[in-house]
Amino acid sequence: MTFILSGFADEISPDLDDQLAILGAESISHLELRSVWSTNVADLSGSQLASFRHALDDAGVRVSAIGSPIGKIELEAPLGPELERMRCVADIASELGTQIVRVFSFFVPPGAPPERHRRQVIDRMFALTEIAEDRGLILAHENEKEIYGDRPERCADLITAVGSPAFRATFDAANFVQCGVQPHTEGYGLLRPYLVYLQVKDALAATGEVVPAGQGDGQVGETLSALRDSGFEGYVSLEPHLGEAGRYGGFSGPQGFRRAAQALKALLDELSISYQ
């Protein structure tokens, strides 16, 4: 089984040429598009998209997924504008030749049990999923801190409640660690039936600090091994967050991204997992 390496190239630099240079240096042939030229993917103009696509074609790089911001808003915010952004992102995904769009399940109001908002979240995710179904896309839900689906049991419940093959899961070990979860022990078994994508960063349980893969408490090696043994073939996407980590993104810089890439490849080699 082969894993395909990818990464959030905006963690390298806002500049596309810089991004492609580092991806090439690390022999990574795909990227996950979250932003470029300091512009979020959902806000890219037609001319920017055309320039982006032509540059990737020239470099021999493809898009593994759209790292969209969809669902990373307050639960009480109006849904209509988010559905419009989802349609825009769907157009971009189709134009760039990828089927996978990362999404989130909304920031829940603090101080109340998240389960109190379950029905509202399900309804919103179902509305987003209907757009994906119409466009032939797969929404990959990321377990993000402070959203409804921040823990494995709520992620799994949400996916089963929506009940569509167009709504699946991506797995972020560091985010689980920062929520007090042992990612592989507590999360992998629940979410493996729905996993279509893996985002790679690790974290220390004691402090929440983000570290390269295999250097924290995220049980990344265990998850990689289990995915291989289960027959997973798909994208393993670096999201290093080694320089900055905020609510809406992160940054590593060229050397930080390379350090994260080399740590992941060393871990895959140690586990005898093939990748390209």
Give the location of each predicted region.
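Short, solvent-exposed loop/turn segments at secondary-structure boundaries
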Residues: 42-46, 75-80, 112-117, 180-183, ...
